[in-house]
């Protein structure tokens, strides 16, 4: 790991914004995606229903993933879709979450507000662009129910929390040697407890302030030049905004003159009722044995991922384990250099609530 990598990670930790999360390379994110995988199994057309009406467009199943045509989102659901010919990029959605899809004749790369995770995988099939149903559920405010027997997916608008989410920019002076582009979400709502609203906003703003403090600490060392100016910035995405729960992904970026930039990703999950920052134990309270299952399963997955390479062995979840919540379930986040090589990217593992909770059990018990 380079000197600048260590500086960035140390500065972030010193700023107190990452509860155990260190900086990781940005290459996985800047590629804006997971590589297009070869389509090995494609099922016949799938019926799509929107608010009870059958749409003319058809979905497809690829390797077990239900894929929805982007054209149907525009033409039938009324979701804004635009195209930038210069960058060959589609923008899907409006508001605080937008999908960006970079498409070529055979590949398609997708991110949400500049953030890519391993659950994102767009497809180009017979000249049409498709995105997985899970992206609609997790980031575009659309509920989706899959009926395997009828080969039908039913879409409807999600019942989101009655809050407003507005991006804010942290004032910072850029110059020829450094660029700061630091933003963070702030929430408001007439039904929110004012103290809870303030507590949540304070945590998110403090995260942004920590990025700026870390950048200024590095800049004070005087190594930046006009030929290779430094950069400090971030992106955020709203991963869950339902049931009185808000989960936010914050992703920070730095470039300090090395061969490549660096990123760090952190999840924050809040109860809107009181502003409490939730731990994994709060989300999965209905299953007192969740750690036993996750520790065993993660060890198996990480051991397979390492394939004998010399990285640290996974032992157990951290007391303040980094995670975020989506409609798809809970995503456990680790740092790149802990368990995997640079080329792998940020190791993340998503588990559905059905996997983590007993039958009939619900997440967020006592928090909503």
Question: What residues fall within each predicted segment?
Answer:
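Sec-dependent signal peptide recognition
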Residues: 6-11
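Hydrophobic helical h-region of N-terminal Sec-dependent signal peptides
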Residues: 13-18
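C-terminal segment of classical bacterial N-terminal signal peptides
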Residues: 19-28
